[in-house]
């Protein structure tokens, strides 16, 4: 089982999209690479904590490779938009790929470099090791499964 943490704006839609991919075993939303300990949703929205809303993805690399997973991820974000996805604006909505296994870095950078060829604007999606991660509150987990008509900046169908 492999793990990658992906930030693509509001984590509700990112989680729903990723959870539908064959080979993704489990997903969880949370807050990553911020400046404080144990942040709440209110903290990341109103204070200068610099956490990103993220989706932690556990996947079976025998079914889907990181390269394939990232290719799907790139389709749901605007990688050239800094701190904004859809109508959501703020550093918590930045795009990012946070890795826990340093052997994944080469595949991540190659994927980003390949994608850059199809954009005239610079890709601003950050690629960093995971520094910290806190699971989001329970009401955020599988939000769009619990609230099928909930807000989502991603076209899921």
UniProtKB/Swiss-Prot annotation:
Q: Which Gene3D superfamilies match?
A: Peptide methionine sulphoxide reductase MsrA
Decide whether keyword Glycoprotein is in the record. Answer: no
Q: Where is the active site?
A: 10
Keyword Oxidoreductase in the entry? The reply is yes
Q: Which domain of life is it from?
A: Bacteria
This entry's Enzyme Commission designation comes to 1.8.4.11
GO biological process per UniProt? cellular response to oxidative stress; protein modification process
* One MF annotation (Gene Ontology) recorded for this entry: peptide-methionine (S)-S-oxide reductase activity
One GO location term (cellular component): cytoplasm
Catalyses: L-methionyl-[protein] + [thioredoxin]-disulfide + H2O = L-methionyl-(S)-S-oxide-[protein] + [thioredoxin]-dithiol; [thioredoxin]-disulfide + L-methionine + H2O = L-methionine (S)-S-oxide + [thioredoxin]-dithiol
What the record says about family reads:
Belongs to the MsrA Met sulfoxide reductase family.
Under which name does UniProt file this protein? Peptide methionine sulfoxide reductase MsrA
Organism of origin: Clostridium perfringens (strain 13 / Type A)
GN (gene name): msrA
């Amino acid at each position: 089982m492999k793990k990658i943490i992906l930030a693509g704006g509001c984590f509700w839609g990112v989680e729903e999209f990723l959870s539908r991919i064959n080979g993704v075993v489990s997903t969880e939303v949370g807050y990553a690479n911020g400046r404080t300990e144990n942040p709440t949703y209110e903290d990341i929205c109103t204070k200068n904590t610099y956490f990103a809303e993220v989706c932690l993805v556990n996947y079976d690399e025998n079914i889907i490779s990181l390269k394939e997973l990232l290719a799907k991820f790139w389709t749901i974000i605007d990688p050239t938009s800094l701190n904004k996805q859809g109508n959501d604006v703020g550093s918590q909505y930045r795009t990012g790929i946070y890795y826990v296994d340093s052997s994944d870095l080469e595949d991540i950078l190659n994927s980003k470099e390949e994608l850059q060829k199809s954009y005239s604007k610079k890709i601003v999606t950050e690629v960093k090791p995971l520094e910290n991660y806190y699971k989001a509150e329970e009401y955020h987990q599988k939000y769009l499964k619990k609230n099928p008509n909930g807000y989502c900046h991603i076209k899921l169908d």
